[in-house]
Curated annotation (Swiss-Prot):
GO terms for biological process: lysyl-tRNA aminoacylation. It is found in: Cytoplasm. Pfam families: tRNA-synt_1f. NCBIfam families: lysS_arch. Its EC number is 6.1.1.6. Its main location: cytoplasm. GO terms for molecular function: ATP binding; lysine-tRNA ligase activity; tRNA binding. The lineage of its organism: Archaea, Methanobacteriati, Methanobacteriota, Stenosarchaea group, Halobacteria. One of its GO terms (cellular component) is cytoplasm. A motif ('KMSKS' region) lies at residues 307-311. This is Lysine--tRNA ligase. Keywords: Aminoacyl-tRNA synthetase, ATP-binding, Cytoplasm, Ligase, Nucleotide-binding, Protein biosynthesis. The gene is lysS.
Amino acid sequence: MAEDPYEVGRGVSRAFWADSVADAIEARDPDEPIVIKGGVSPSGVPHIGHFNEIMRGYYVAEALRDRGHEVRQVFTADDKDRLRAVPRQLADLDWNVVGLGEVDAGALGRNLGKPYTDIPDPFGCCDSYGAHFTALLQKSAELVGVDVEFVSNTELYADGEFEAVTRRVLERADRARDVLAEYQNKVDDDYVPFLPQCAECGKITEGVTAVDLDAGEVEYVCEDVEAGDQTIDGCGHEGTATLRDGKLPWRFEWPAQWEILGVDFEPFGKDHAEGSWPSGEDVAENVLDIQPPVPMVYEWFTLDGEPLSSSSGNVITVDEVLDILEPEVFKYFFVKDPRKQRDFSVENIDQLVDEFDRFERRYFEEIEASEDDAELAERAYPMVVDDPREQRIRIPYTFAAVLGMTDDPALREQIARKEGHIPDDAPEWAVEQALARVERAQEWASLTNNEFNYELKRAEIPEVSFDDATAAALDELADFIAEGHDGEAIQSEIYETAKRNDIDISEFFSAGYRLLFDDTEGPQLGTFIAKLDREFVVERFRRNE
């Protein structure tokens, strides 16, 4: 009996869950290389939910490598699976997401029921539909700097890797039926655990009528197949298929992969924990006579409070994430306890960045930390950041968003230095990396249209005019700013100046925003003004430039 997937990674003596998983793997004294596996059907645009499995495996692999083990991290593209439904959205290899109207959706519909690797790539750039979406997932791993070996199920079948285990399952068909009946309704006495591919129409069918293991063949009729709430029509062809011309059903294919690849550990979502894992464990032990790998359940993510769903379009890709986050911040997100459901909130992404920055400072012992937090930083940080360097600078994310209001690189650096976020002795590489966060924060502000989504009109003053009272009040405020007050004092003085000149406060704020942004709204004015070059602000409020 394998370990409880809900308990693996829960070791109380370890601050980092990946170390607890590594303990469980080592306890089995596995052969080397230790194999860590994940997998997914390349059914459509891969998102951060699919990436969960890669990252959980990555951290366990790194924990084992730290202990001197040789580790192979593989990820199977379950690309011999049939296309069950036409997706709502697709993406090209540059991550441009398109609707079905921009590709030949009819071709996809005509290929329902066929393996992903037998369906033409809608964009015409890869060998197949399956190859296209596997390539996107592989690119995701490369973007984050995670080295994963991708394995095609279709190729494993074609190369005969599945043949021996498929034969064994069919030899033990009675035993396979008894096991499956524990987890699935309506397992008929004539059920055969093999899905041939029709030689006529190319669809994966279920209508096996006879098995000849001496010849290594099955006879079949291409029947209709239920796929969710729809039926995929069979063509009625009667034929013969070899054990390479088809596939095992999922509940048998998954444990077969464990045997073929020699898998020692596999993480999976809670949907599998309550369905596929118990049956897979049973099949492994009682049909294949192998030991299942060490399992671990991870919780799903939500996106801005809603379930990730490709069908509903509520997804975010790794490429989109890296438009607003450094790769190391995204990797840090997966350091967190996998057993807790977490929300990936784009709107509040600044909080995740701030949390990462504190995590980094704990590693360099720049801030106090609890014993567990200090141990977690010590263990995980070198896995998150490829090149730990104490001189690295992190500009606070929301401040970086403020800097993003101007496109002037020199001004960005000037303001950051003025506010103390870039030390005088900072090396050039550290300054360059620190300011690179500005572009991401600027993209975040634009994406969420938040309070930082404004453009400072520095080059020339917007075309604005004010009545005499407002003009006089702006001159008074300019004099106050020239005295060198901080943001809080300036914010307070804005109210006082409006009051002295009998001006509506909202209109006075609008006057300031119009001068700076050519807009009637903006960030907290006093705080923002204090971050800018004082001479520029004074001259702008005096309408001199």
